[in-house]
Regions:
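Acidic/His- and Gly-rich active-site-bordering loop/insert found
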Residues: 1-52, 71-78
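Broad gene-expression machinery/nucleic-acid interaction feature
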Residues: 5, 80, 135-137
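Residue-level signal for secondary-structure boundary sites
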Residues: 16, 28, 91, 122, ...
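Fold-independent oxyanion-binding glycine-rich loops
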Residues: 22-24, 46, 87, 116-119, ...
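Short, conserved micro-motifs enriched in small and acidic residues
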Residues: 49-62, 90, 155, 159, ...
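Acidic/histidine-rich catalytic neighborhood of metal-dependent amide-processing enzymes
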Residues: 55-131
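Midchain, well-structured core segments that form catalytic/ion-binding scaffolds
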Residues: 97, 105-171
Length: 171
């Protein structure tokens, strides 16, 4: 079996398509908790909640729905919003490509993707991340000739396949 996903489709009042992505799985429990605190029983202490995953983006589903409700309460129009919540992000999202393909027609082409998963510099204040770097894996093959030639005899006449690859990757 595959890990589950939650896919919410919230109709919009204006054109557009937003995809909000988050996860609900957590890192494995850790050792080294203070006395009276631990991974399995949530504890309120000094107006803070302590427990496993308390600061690991468990808010994704709540935050996405709350943001749409806040817009509705204020009478602010919003585009269609799809909320995709997965349960295998901490394991490298092995099932996410399957679900993205399975749901591709429903998801369509988002105008904006909001990632509900980021880091925090400390636990004393709220943090907002406005952009993330992406990652892509690919196999690239650049061919410039049908047969090999010595660089001393073709340098300057034959384009460098490495230079072409660098140009493609930097575009």
């Amino acid at each position: 079996g595959r890990t589950p996903i939650i896919l919410l489709d919230i109709p919009g009042t204006v054109d557009g398509n937003i995809l909000m992505y988050g996860h609900l799985d957590k890192q494995p429990e850790m050792e080294g908790w203070e006395e009276g605190l631990g991974p399995w029983t949530p504890v309120m202490k000094d107006d803070k909640l302590y427990g496993r995953g308390g600061a690991d983006d468990g808010y994704a589903l709540f935050a996405s729905i709350s943001s749409i409700l806040a817009l509705k309460e204020q009478g602010i129009d919003h585009p269609r919003v799809l909320v995709l919540i997965e349960f295998s992000e901490e394991s490298g999202s092995p099932d996410l490509p399957h679900y993205m393909e399975l749901c591709s027609e429903k998801i369509g082409t988002p105008d904006l993707v909001v990632c509900l998963d980021s880091g925090a510099g400390d636990y004393k204040r709220f943090w907002t991340t406005t952009s993330l770097r992406g990652l892509i894996g690919l196999t690239m093959k650049v061919e410039v000739l049908t047969e090999g030639v010595h660089s001393g005899g073709a340098s300057g006449h034959v384009p460098s396949s490495f230079r072409i690859a660098r140009k493609l990757l930097s575009s």
